[in-house]
Amino acid sequence: LGSASVHVKLIKAAQEMGIYTITTDNVPYEDSPGKKIADEYWNLNIYDVKEIVKKAKKEHIDGVICGWLDPCQRPYFQICHELGLPCYGDEKQFFKMTDKHAFKKMCEENNVDIIDEFTEADIKGNKVEFPVFVKPVDSRGSRGQAVCYTMKELLSAIEVAKEESSNGDVLIEKYIKGSQEFHVTYFFVDGEPYLLRTSDNYCGSEEMHMEKVVSCAVMPSRYTSQYIEKAHPNVVKMFKNLGIKNGPIFMQGFEDNGVFRFFDPGLRFPGVDYELVFKKVFNVDLMKAMIQIALTGKTDVVIPKDAAFIKGGRASVLYLTIRACTISHLDGE
């Protein structure tokens, strides 16, 4: 489900397993890397659950999977549910890992630290401490997000964020500046969590208006040992309480003077290709594990317990935030 570049590795994995692979979304073929390599493609919007289910029944589809694309998460569950096919999450799990208010409440219930939030009552009572960060409750990427330094900017940003939110709900949080952005990814196998990845993420410059856009991630995070000691136990407890059995889960947050504060979740992998690095280092194919889950509901993948430390090595992922152009050269070792 979804034909973007982050799903190319998933399509290739299925094909290597000898599985006839179909991909669908409403993106034109020429702009869709997944459609160019799939055995077959449909031009059905990922939100058109009714038509996808209808066609899937007609074609006798054996499994459905996504795993890397944020907007596919809830439709993925709905499609699997209607078809009676395995799905690595249920309705409650996908809701709590896509709705930021529900996620923050779950964190509070499990003693996982979050970012301080302001309410409409705080606005009316003039109790907002600027600067603040405004965002839709469930939009993807940086859509509808804004940093606000005045009440005028805040009121304007709220209206923009509401337009990008599926239900008109928005979040108003304390703007964290100067702290290290920190990501964490887990993979569950038969109810047991494995810490796959920690990363320190670096955003672009304010001068180029790229301060909200990640340009580079370095793995493992320099705070990994500290995270495992201070936050990991409660995070694992939270996910087990949520009932996660198999599949990926990740969170974005900040390291804030020894406190790990999380703000954005996903019942999926982050939208990068780190799993290819993981495969190269450990000879463990997480994409094929996802295909197993799609077909059987389980996976026999074996993940090293200290995987997040990458055997003592380092890795980085660069995010090319550039306009359409021709790259003249690349340097490096």
Spans of features found by a protein language model:
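ATP-binding N-terminal substructure of ATP-dependent carboxylate-amine bond-forming enzymes
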Residues: L1-Q93, G297-V301, K305
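Short, conserved charged micro-motifs
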Residues: K50-E51, L154-S156, A324-D331
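Short acidic/polar active-site loop segments enriched in Thr and Asp
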Residues: D62, G168, K240
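Protein kinase-like catalytic core scaffold
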Residues: V132, Y194, R261-D264
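Peripheral (often C-terminal) accessory segments that flank ATP-dependent C-N-forming ligase machineries
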Residues: I291-E333
